[in-house]
Amino acid sequence: LVGAASWHDVLSHILSTQGFNTIMLSLKTSIAVVVLTLIVGFPVAYILALKQFRGKAVLDTLIDLPIVMPPLVTGLCLLLLLNPSNPFGRLLQQWGIELLFSPYGIVLAQFFVASPFFIKTARESIAAIPSNLLSASATLKASDFYTFRNVILPLCRKGASTGLAMTWARALGEFGATAMVAGNIPGKTETMTIAIYMEAMSGGLNRSISTALVLVLFSFTLLFILKIQAGRQYEY
């Protein structure tokens, strides 16, 4: 990729209106997915790791399913669910909620595909916490929220940070489900991955390479920073 296009072409494409809008849309949606994953994912990971309830195995399997299921299939399921011909999609339409072929649809598709990486990693990190620490907190009559905030969260920070980095990178690189749910509307739903595909198929190989380089650079930089902050050791 580095030697496939001149830096002049790369910079020209990045600074163009289309290239800039594509990059900004991808960053905004992937960051929104990270925030949504934190809000939803931590409680789910906590429940799966420490609570016992009927249907736990089913919920656990459903959460892990998008990891192994083709993104196109995930996107197709969401497309059918949100379609106005479906009762749920019709209800959303009556409420004025537009998800299909919109940036919100991008966030939804990326969330379903990427959030399991965080939930799975956070769940395993929480489950690895020594039970005597949790028992001590319970003996002191600490609430579940206090235990989560002051015992669980600090101890699973490294694993959660890694999972969050994986989620962000997966959301940023998502293509199949996004294309099914949001389509390709330039300036509205054209993410970097969709732009890479469309440019390559239409003969704009240099523009496709330029966008791919930006995607690789963003992914490498953020993953590197997050893992260093998590205290991981790396070979340089």
Regions found by a protein language model. Give the residues of each.
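Hydrophobic transmembrane alpha-helix segments characteristic of membrane transport
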Residues: 9-10
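Membrane-water interface segments at the C-terminal ends of transmembrane alpha-helices
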Residues: 1-6, 15-127, 151-176, 199, ...
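The alpha-helix within a helix-turn-helix
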Residues: 137
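Short glycine/proline-centered loop/turn elements that form peptide/ligand docking sites
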Residues: 129-133
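Short coil/turn motifs that cap or connect alpha-helices
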Residues: 54, 142-144
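Short, Lys/Arg-enriched, Gly/Pro-containing loop segments at transmembrane-helix junctions
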Residues: 232-236
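Glycine-rich helix-loop "coupling/hinge" segments at transmembrane-helix boundaries
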Residues: 80, 177-203
